[in-house]
Amino acid sequence: MKVKASVKPICQKCKVVKRKGVVRVICQDPRHKQRQG
């Protein structure tokens, strides 16, 4: 899980999702997981 100020999709399968007011990127590749913070 990477914590970044600006989250961006890295590949085609990355999805930007908002959960409980937190912007996240979910992907099949676990290295692409990101959270805004």
Curated annotation (Swiss-Prot):
Keywords: Ribonucleoprotein, Ribosomal protein. InterPro entries: Ribosomal_bL36 (IPR000473), Ribosomal_bL36_sp (IPR035977). PROSITE patterns: RIBOSOMAL_L36. The keyword Transferase does not apply. It holds the Pfam family Ribosomal_L36. The keyword Amino-acid biosynthesis does not apply. This is Large ribosomal subunit protein bL36.
